[in-house]
């Protein structure tokens, strides 16, 4: 689950980290009033969406008057912001963050992520702030410095000092960086984060460290024990199909292709997408119905896949282990009848009751294409999609 920048900064402030005074506003009038609360004569106004690249898309502005703030809010609130990280529709802007302006002398990067390889929370720091860390990792990996947290003792001051020295910080800045590092480390563990970024972490004109931006992703599997963070969820930022799928315990991710995929098991789903690509097709989604798939969930899965107007054909790939292929076949038949499927459906069944499932599909009288293997299924669905 992602948080907005203003929500991330609220958490930073709770842990004693230096952030700009700011207010998240839902109306142009609120935005103008926020400037009065903050004071000064220059403010930064930012669209709040779950995507990067806001500045280049016009979603961040330096405002020198309340009229500029009001105009910015009127222009963006209720509209969608399209960035390089969103799809063509963009993300809806429901709040504008108005905050005080900071004079920047230098930009740094500080982030943390759960590293599955080392099974540790790993902090990353770099002197190359303000740019994508992926770009830095690709072009100049030697400029990224790391510190892995011991799961028994958590963040340690010596780790912060080592990173501070590598970033070229001096004097009071080292103390400030240590406080930020320790706070972020504790926050990461307390709040079950999966990813945390401050990009940029800036050195101000006065020589102090300041958290200018904030990006947080929370481990969705831990939300049951984070009631406060659950309340921060903004459903307006979710793909409606993904939200619908979550209600039925389906793992669905929308993609840009034209071949709908319904598979049981995440690994098999990824393999199915790969083989569709291998044979010249383009998956429209990732959809894992899980090991405990029911007839009702299969029906809902079909509805979700077909709600995407780009879908020209559907591939159902089921390996029956826990789940029975005949039950999946009943779900497919029921879904095709209920939804009124107008696109070709290719089905590959293997494993538990696969023969019985295949017979049920054959006896249904519906226009369902049976595949003999995964390769055959991929070839058939690509051919069917091209024919549409």
Curated annotation (Swiss-Prot):
Keywords: ATP-binding, Ligase, Magnesium, Metal-binding, Nucleotide-binding, Tricarboxylic acid cycle. Pathway: Carbohydrate metabolism; tricarboxylic acid cycle; succinate from succinyl-CoA (ligase route): step 1/1. Residues 9-244 form the ATP-grasp domain. ATP binds at residues 46, 53-55, 99, 102, 107. One of its GO terms (molecular function) is succinate-CoA ligase (GDP-forming) activity. GO terms for cellular component: cytosol; succinate-CoA ligase complex. Coiled coil: none annotated. It is an enzyme of class 6 (ligase). GO terms for biological process: succinyl-CoA metabolic process; tricarboxylic acid cycle. It catalyses: succinate + ATP + CoA = succinyl-CoA + ADP + phosphate; GTP + succinate + CoA = succinyl-CoA + GDP + phosphate. It comes from the Bacteria. Its EC number is 6.2.1.5. Heterotetramer of two alpha and two beta subunits. PANTHER family: SUCCINATE--COA LIGASE [GDP-FORMING] SUBUNIT BETA, MITOCHONDRIAL, SUCCINYL-COA SYNTHETASE BETA CHAIN. Belongs to the succinate/malate CoA ligase beta subunit family. NCBIfam families: PRK00696.1, sucCoAbeta. This is Succinate--CoA ligase [ADP-forming] subunit beta. It comes from Aeromonas hydrophila subsp. hydrophila (strain ATCC 7966 / DSM 30187 / BCRC 13018 / CCUG 14551 / JCM 1027 / KCTC 2358 / NCIMB 9240 / NCTC 8049).
